[in-house]
Amino acid sequence: MELKEKFGSKLPSENSQKIFLEFVSANPTGPLHIGHARGAVFGDSLAKIARFLGHEVLCEYYVNDMGSQIRLLGLSVWLAYREHVLKESVTYPEVFYKGEYIIEIAKKARNDLEPSLFQENEEIIIEVLSGYAKDLMLLEIKDNLDSLGIHFDSYASEREIFKCKDAVFERLEKANALYEKDSKIWLKSSLYQDESDRVLIKEDKTYTYLAGDIVYHDEKFQQNYTKYINIWGADHHGYIARVKASLEFLGYDSNKLEVLLAQMVRLLKDNEPYKMSKRAGNFILIKDVIDDVGKDALRFIFLSKRLDTHLEFDVNTLKKQDSSNPIYYIHYANSRIHTMLEKSPFSKEEILQTPLKNLNAEEKYLLFSALSLPKIIEASFEEYGLQKICEYAKTLASEFHHFYNAGKILDTPKAKELLKICLMVSLSLTNAFKLLGIEIKTRISVKD
């Protein structure tokens, strides 16, 4: 069992890194949709791989729990409350949060909150509903993440961290990083390869999103990790330079920050665009897809291509029970191995203690492939290429199926030697799937 758990892993050493990994960090203004899932699954598996290789990792979710989007959430719930609870005629603004989940929150608020609240002036109502709805959404997000097998070490509140803004802005001023123009406060980010300088404080004295992010990154960098990894959506590409500029002004080494960008996901079903969720408006919810194909299939397909490339797949492929469905084909390989072990007269201990001698070319090739997992894991971590593990598992499963179909394994004089090779294949497939956050099956049936 110890061999099984540790095969391919490394113990912490002087070369081990201390990594701060921030990912998902979706605004708590709605349920998680499929666009969030890719970065979520990637970040979770990257953390598993890093820990497997002996590194220390902290996984954090940055909760954007202040600002205009949170107020807009409260306003949207208040308008839904007036329309669906008070039965008033309501005029909605051009921009607001829509979907059945907003109506659900409004109706729940009627039961959860004091009736007297709704007699207050509108700004107080919106403020209370903003916090109430945000808390509900964060609970739902955590539930969505749990259904994907993802758990964070910490959730950082933007509202709490931003209380330190004055000290951070004072340091930026001392570093000559700020100036005033057009009644706004600007960051001289163009000095550090940004396209232009950026506004931190607007004319109305409110802070921009960047200001909050600068305070957050200062809080992170004070913890002195070896490396900081952020996983953002590809639409945040232009944001990298301005954050790195702020780090330099604050006296940090911005090279310690690596930003990985997650490209878009396009889901199909029967070669048609996947149906949007009525509950969330114009989004495909993670929960809907998990209910459709399962957590493991979803994780595998999201990790099967580089994070920075577009991903398109038909969910019906993940329901097929043939070689066109990679995750089924890998499960099937492991199931075949375990079925042979059950039929074998030898114990696992006997098999593992059998010396491997006089192997032919095909047997050596399969054994070599099974033993290649450690270098695949290292390469996937160093290159942030987690798809390498998916490709490895698919290839190893295919090689095993070819080996299995080519001749007998149990009814031969070399049965123990061949079973040992098969055990090594199973071990590598199991650990590969473990790092992908997938539990490999030891038995499958047609119903699976």
Placement of each model-derived feature along the sequence:
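Non-catalytic interaction-recognition regions
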Residues: 4-448
